[in-house]
Structures are given as structure tokens and as C-alpha cells.
């Protein structure tokens, strides 16, 4: 066996080993990836609906949608992660974004 053949074999073996290690995470990655993509698509569509001739109203409407996207993504990560810091940040984000959403919606209803 030539040196080049041994290198190719080693590279293929390493790739196969890494694939085997990754397989348990693939189901999660596919599920979370789909949820994140759905959240982003929903947020983007809602932000476009928020366009308004008044730049202040447009900003407020788009921020409501943006905050909802952050809330949705935080809920996704909470279903999947056990990391304490990420969990705290996601939970805090949900609380703060929900509160700010309400403030913005109140402002929008008055203007």
C-alpha cells in the first residue's frame, strides 16, 4: 500500500468515525433546525407585514414580530438544551421580550 493510499484510508476512517459520533445528534439537529427555520420564516413574514408609511409605527410593528421570533427560538432551545446558562438566557429573553411586546402593542393601539 502506498503512502497516498494509507492517507486516503486514514482520512476515510476518520470521516466515518466522526459520522458515527454525530448520528445521535442528527435527529435533534434536524428537528431544532426545522423549528428555527420556521420561526425565522414566520418572523420575516410578520416583519414585512409591519411595514408602514410612518417609520415609527413601522419600527414598533416590526419589533413586535422580531420579539416573537426571539420568543419562539427561545422556546425551541429550552426544549433541547440542558446548558444552565443558555436556559437562563432563554427564560430571561422570553420574559423580557414578552413584556416589551406588550408595551409595543399598547403603543401601536394608541397611535
At which residue positions do the language-model features occur?
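His/Met- and acidic-residue-enriched segments that coordinate or traffic transition-metal cofactors
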Residues: 2-13, 25-111
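Sec-dependent N-terminal signal peptides
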Residues: 16-21
